[in-house]
Amino acid sequence: MSGINSRNQKMEQQRQLMEAYIRQKRASPGMVQASDLQINRPMSGMRSNSRELHAYDGPMQFISSPQNPDQILTNGSPGGINPVAMNTSRNHSNNMRSLSTINQEADLIEEISSHELEDEESSPVTVIEQHQQSASHSANSTQSQKPRARQHSFSDNLDEDDYTNRNVAGAAPVRPAGMASSPYKDATLDGSSNGTGNGTGGESEGDVIGNIDQFVMQPAPQGVLYKCRITRDRKGMDRGLFPIYYLHLERDYGKKIFLLGGRKRKKSKTSNYIVSCDPTDLSRNADGFCGKLRSNVFGTSFTVFDNGNKESTESPRLDLAVIIYDTNILGFKGPRNMTVILPGMTEDDQRVKISSADPKQQGILDLWKMKNMDNIVELHNKTPVWNDETQSYVLNFHGRVTQASVKNFQLVHDSDPEYIVMQFGRTSEDVFTMDYRYPLCAMQAFAIALSSFDGKIACE
């Protein structure tokens, strides 16, 4: 009994130290994590091999030794009856308490080790409990009987159970084919008004059409979702400070198609990224040069340009997007706030041509500052939901994001916050997912993601 009591005291001390460590980690700036992760997912091989649990909770648990759970006591009495089993009312309850303490310690160790693998920029985040998801689903199903705006999942290939088990963060809608040119018009929930009538809005996964250099600049067709993956290459002499980013379009059976590559220029007063569809030549003079991303001094505002010439009148340089991050001078904790301004769309789903290099017209940023919204579209990142139970910010990425990070975001329009124009998030140390749809093109979406990678003096 004295051995068990001393063991319990040690366990209690270790548990208090671990809880203090967790509270200290949670005091750092908040991050955003996907709220649709599996609650009881298996541990990775690295963590399971580094931890050894000496516990047995099977039907023969009552014959385990309290000092060494791996040892099975033999029958020592002449009648073949185990002397430990004769006192089951006391020793069995003691063993149960000991095993319960060990399991609690194991859960705390697993939680600590999982925090060390998360994004080092902010505090750990957990997932929403299953009963909260069910409560949210029942409320949504009651309201869905009335006609309202379309609310469909971002991942249309999920089965019915995955789609209906939405959490409180809300599910992203799917834009059906054949809708009006504006992506923010209301539609019926089942999509039958547009002839789809399949319950998922008829949205399909996009594929490359035509040449790569033309495809990456063309706005996504309505009713098409492009699922992409961004990999960060930090290997080499100077790629620790100037990594190269590669954008691939995901296809079936693990296949992928290269779309764009991006690199930060070394000799530049401000952050300046070159984007090219040629992965072997990421320079302004390359044939595959598609455009660039340029920031201001503080890293709070980014402008996306195409490959046009600023001095040319025949093919002037066009503004593709402006990304603005809210300043955080006082150091308030929480996720980032960003605003994305895009050129408006014409009736034939083409971008309005806006050039800040043309002295006869104003650029996207100037139009936005003057509140002239006739030819521009303003998007915002979807506000994450704060979960009091898990003490974390959560968003529903529908299985596309698996790690917490301050870089995780979803872009929506104020008139239809359920239509996810773009979402971006971390899946591993140097791998990120990027999904986009109308009215974005691959060049715009990739540049927005690059702005999230760049360091921001006044935002962190």
UniProtKB/Swiss-Prot annotation:
Name its cellular compartments: Cytoplasm; Nucleus; Cell projection, Cilium membrane; Cell projection, Rhabdomere
Any Pfam family from its record, for instance, is: Tub
Where do Low complexity bias regions lie?
130-145
Where's it mainly located?
Answer: cytoplasm
Keywords on this record?
Answer: Cell membrane, Cell projection, Cytoplasm, Lipid-binding, Membrane, Nucleus, Phosphoprotein
Q: Does the keyword Cell membrane apply?
A: yes
Which residues does this entry mark as bearing Phosphoserine?
A: S153
Question: Origin, by domain of life?
Answer: Eukaryota
Output compositional bias ranges, type Polar residues: 85-97
Task: State where composition is biased (Gly residues).
Answer: 194-203
What Gene3D superfamilies does its record include? Tubby Protein, Chain A
- GO terms, biological process: endocytosis; glucose homeostasis; negative regulation of opsin-mediated signaling pathway; protein localization to cilium; response to sucrose; sensory perception of sound; triglyceride homeostasis
Which PROSITE patterns does the protein's record reference? Answer: TUB_1, TUB_2
Domain notes from UniProt: The C-terminus is important for mediating light-induced rhodopsin endocytosis.
Q: Which family does it belong to?
A: Belongs to the TUB family.
Q: What is this protein called?
A: Protein king tubby
Q: What is the lineage of its organism?
A: Eukaryota, Metazoa, Ecdysozoa, Arthropoda, Hexapoda
